[in-house]
């Protein structure tokens, strides 16, 4: 119906879903300008949407993106393949000239020659793309925006979590993963299952202890002896830390655990929080185990993939406009992009995305135009586990993005090439210290798993919770 009125208008605004489904209509026209908002959606050149968009005929092309590089520099090639086809060569040529040297220099075992080659490739890429990239950060355009403070909140695993973690290091699954990582034909399915398993162990034992778990009888005996239940929050270092963090923020404080005067003050100065999880099952734990049982005074609402798209705006509006709602529970996938949640001034990440841009986008749901308070961001990290590796990978990817696309991006001098070799070199001091501190309680297999992965899982793999039943069988020693 709208297509029939096309010639009466000078501007067409369309969602990416419409472009994909009605591609014939958009490809049949010759446009003067084609502007992609959140243009990093075409970072994967092999998707149908990317192929359709790159076939659109237009005199001028422009991409708007807060995160043009999320995982690797090959994504930048895909964006330029839309803007200026051929400017960075073919995908194969780009990989050979830029992608491969940069990836090799990232390897912890890379030689000084490989590190230097990676730095030179990065510098060359920066020089070539510099004239076509304009970067503006919030601090440049929103000088009245309150600051955003990011803090890492470390928590220790419970005794049961430590047992499950150590059992994994002695299991057949660990041997299978080690073989997969070191073999020429890596079986990424096993790696993802192992990572998913360990991530759930870091969250709460009940997420992995099912009837098919080989240690289920020993775990039940342990729980019986401790006179607790499997779902108890004391078996999760993260839930205990989350409870304390919320209480420190004045959320969930009642007269029973505070004086009347302090309780009144906590209500007056109370913060409101966004709590992000990767997995819906962990959101369930926070809601059903922490809030309903241990913090019943907390008022909350929830936004995840089970909420119809048409109902999400109403939930956002209700949270922003009703200060009596303490917490909004969200999955990073659903709530991490495009929403305005300035009703909150506290953001808590219970889990973390491999892609640092996803977490940055999520925390900026609160830190945006309209926010009047300082935004405090807390990242719960299970000490001595693969989560510390995840945060290390996040830092590396942010350094890559910030080196290619600098803060100013107005001249070649804006890129400090003297620090590039440090970016790709192993920080031996910190690495050794970390290794000594964590080797006693961190399975060596985790390091092998993560260093052996060439590509980190995407949104679809996050959305699909792997069936771990078959994987459980390989946990037997």
For each feature predicted by the language model, list its residue ranges.
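ASCE P-loop NTPase motor core, strongest for the SF2 helicase catalytic module
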Residues: 1-106, 126-151, 157-163, 167-477
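A short helix-loop-helix "switch/interaction" segment in the helical subdomain of ASCE P-loop NTPases
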Residues: 112-120, 150-156
């Amino acid at each position: 119906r709208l297509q029939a009125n096309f010639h009466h208008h000078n501007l067409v605004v369309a969602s990416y879903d419409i472009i994909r489904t009605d591609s014939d209509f958009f490809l049949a026209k010759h446009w003067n300008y084609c502007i992609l908002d959140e243009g990093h959606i075409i970072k994967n050149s092999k998707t149908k949407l990317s192929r359709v968009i790159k076939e659109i005929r237009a005199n001028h092309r422009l991409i708007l993106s807060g995160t043009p590089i999320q995982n690797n520099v090959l994504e930048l090639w895909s964006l330029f393949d839309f803007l200026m086809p051929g400017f960075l060569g073919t995908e194969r040529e780009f990989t050979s000239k830029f992608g491969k040297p940069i990836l090799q220099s990232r390897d912890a075992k890379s030689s000084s020659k490989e590190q230097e080659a990676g730095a030179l490739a990065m510098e060359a890429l920066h020089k070539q793309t510099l004239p076509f990239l304009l970067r503006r950060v919030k601090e440049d355009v929103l000088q009245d925006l309150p600051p955003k403070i990011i803090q890492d909140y470390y928590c220790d695993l419970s005794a049961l979590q430590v047992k499950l973690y150590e059992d994994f290091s002695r299991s057949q699954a660990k041997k299978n993963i080690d073989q997969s990582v070191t073999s020429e034909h890596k079986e990424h399915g096993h790696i993802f299952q192992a990572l998913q398993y360990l991530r759930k162990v870091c969250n709460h034992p009940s997420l992995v202890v099912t009837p098919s778990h080989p240690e289920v009888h020993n775990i039940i005996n342990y729980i019986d002896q401790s006179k607790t239940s499997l779902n108890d929050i004391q078996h999760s270092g993260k839930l205990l830390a989350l409870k304390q963090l919320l209480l420190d923020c004045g959320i969930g404080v009642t007269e029973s655990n505070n004086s009347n005067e302090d309780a009144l003050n906590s209500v007056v100065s109370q913060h409101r929080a966004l709590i992000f999880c990767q997995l819906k099952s962990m959101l369930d734990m926070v809601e059903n185990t922490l809030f309903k049982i241990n913090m019943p005074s907390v008022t909350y609402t929830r936004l995840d993939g089970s909420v119809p798209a048409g109902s999400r705006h109403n939930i956002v509006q209700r949270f922003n406009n009703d200060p009596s709602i303490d917490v909004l529970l969200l999955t990073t996938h659903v709530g991490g992009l495009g929403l305005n949640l300035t009703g909150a001034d506290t953001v808590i990440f219970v889990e973390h995305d491999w892609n640092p841009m996803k977490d940055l986008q999520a925390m900026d749901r609160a830190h945006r135009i309209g926010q009047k308070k300082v935004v405090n961001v807390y990242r719960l990290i299970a000490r001595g586990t693969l989560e510390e590796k995840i945060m290390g990978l996040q830092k590396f990817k942010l350094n890559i993005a910030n080196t290619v696309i600098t803060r100013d991006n107005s001249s070649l001098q804006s890129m400090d090439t003297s620090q590039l070799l440090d970016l790709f070199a192993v920080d031996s001091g910190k690495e050794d210290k970390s290794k000594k501190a964590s080797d006693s309680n961190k399975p060596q297999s985790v390091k092998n798993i993560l260093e052996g992965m060439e590509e980190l899982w995407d949104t679809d793999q996050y959305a699909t919770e792997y069936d771990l039943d078959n994987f459980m069988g390989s946990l037997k020693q």
